[in-house]
Amino acid sequence: MEDIPTMVKVDRGESQILSCRGRRCGLKVLGYVTGDMKEFANWLKDKPVVLQFMDWILRGISQVVFVSNPISGILILAGLLVQNPWWALCGCVGTVVSTLTALLLSQDRSAIAAGLQGYNATLVGILMAVFSDKGDYFWWLIFPVSAMSMTCPVFSSALSSLFSKWDLPVFTLPFNMALSLYLSATGHYNTFFPSKLFMPVSSVPNITWSELSALELLKSLPVGVGQIYGCDNPWTGAIFLCAILLSSPLMCLHAAIGSLLGVIAGLSLAAPFKDIYSGLWGFNSSLACIAIGGMFMALTWQTHLLALACALFTAYFGACMTHLMAAVHLPACTWSFCLATLLFLLLTTENPNIYRMPLSKVTYSEENRIFYLQNKKRVVDSPL
């Protein structure tokens, strides 16, 4: 009878050990699929080139939102298929062609492997399909999509050479340049490849504040994130947020906050409700909030506030760019995000808590913060 309590204690101890091991195993597995999946990339190095190439393409698709994670790329591709399979196909074609062009031009292999030579062409392919006046499955569009995607590595390499003097990223400037060139060359009245007609505002919008819908405003938050890829389906935007969350919860949080600030900016300028509901006020500010809030600046409460300011500034600047670009019958694209965020990254300050990450060390928000804290500790511990 005296042995029974002892056996119970032993069983409880074993169950606690097994439970701890299970948790550790779960965390280890989670570590392999979150962040930038560096271990997976290392594992692929001696595998067939086809598998490596698929990894590069998926990372390129996800790099639009600063994520280098193939599983996130699969989720984003699934979201694009939910929105429109034709857009997804054009985006994939653009990514593949751009990556192959970068290989032919002997661009940095590590940048190609991280998807940095594919993401601009992802947007080029998708947005050329979105703005095509021929509708879906106009197969001839594949040719200009491929041609313009080939220019993206050229623009990226040239801009990188220029921006490297200040250790700045090129963001989506190659996409903006390629798409603007294409739409300027073709336009709405082109016989072969007509695009949608972009016109400046010519009358005062009819705003009735009593018709403002709280539900539509709530839906506009994921839609704002979805519009980064030109998508207006809230389910697609929600999938994109999940893809970002898988890689970095901090980046997902800032993506949602940025979209919210874009909505607030739109309401403060009495923008047409349909523009706010469709996410057109949220996507640039969402990207800006991610970029400053932990991606290219280490996350502290100071840089978090700076990210909020940058997101609001980007949203208002986006309205300015929309009017300016409409005057020449072009969409605003992500010009406001690129220009506003570069402006904030060039900010100089003596505050050590506003720390811009060296471009070669940028990974994802959580890892960037660890690098910043370790660097800060080394500075404190080093002798004078």
From Swiss-Prot:
Record membrane topology: Multi-pass membrane protein
GO CC term, one of those recorded: basolateral plasma membrane
Summary of the function given for this chain in its UniProt record: Mediates the transport of urea driven by a concentration gradient across the cell membrane. Mediates the transport of urea across the cell membranes of erythrocytes and the renal inner medullary collecting duct which is critical to the urinary concentrating mechanism. Facilitates water transport in erythrocytes.
Residues with glycosylation annotation: N206
Family: Belongs to the urea transporter family.
UniProt keyword annotations, A-Z: Cell membrane, Glycoprotein, Membrane, Transmembrane, Transmembrane helix, Transport
Signal peptide as annotated in the record: none
Residues at the site labelled Important for channel permeability: T334
Database matches in PANTHER family: UREA TRANSPORTER, UREA TRANSPORTER 1
Subcellular location: Cell membrane; Basolateral cell membrane
Catalytic activity: urea(in) = urea(out)
Transmembrane segments: 61-81, 85-105, 111-131, 138-158, 168-188, 250-270, 279-299, 305-325, 327-347
GO biological process annotation, one example: establishment of localization in cell
Gene Ontology terms, MF aspect: urea channel activity; urea transmembrane transporter activity; water transmembrane transporter activity
Quaternary structure annotation from Swiss-Prot or TrEMBL: Homotrimer; each subunit contains a pore through which urea permeates. Identified in a complex with STOM.
Listed name of the protein: Urea transporter 1
Expressed in which tissues: Expressed in brain, spleen, kidney, testis and lung, with highest levels in brain.
The keyword Glycoprotein is assigned to this record: yes
InterPro entries assigned to the protein according to its UniProt record, in alphabetical order: Ammonium/urea_transptr, Urea_transporter
Keyword set includes Transmembrane: yes
Pfam families xref list: UT
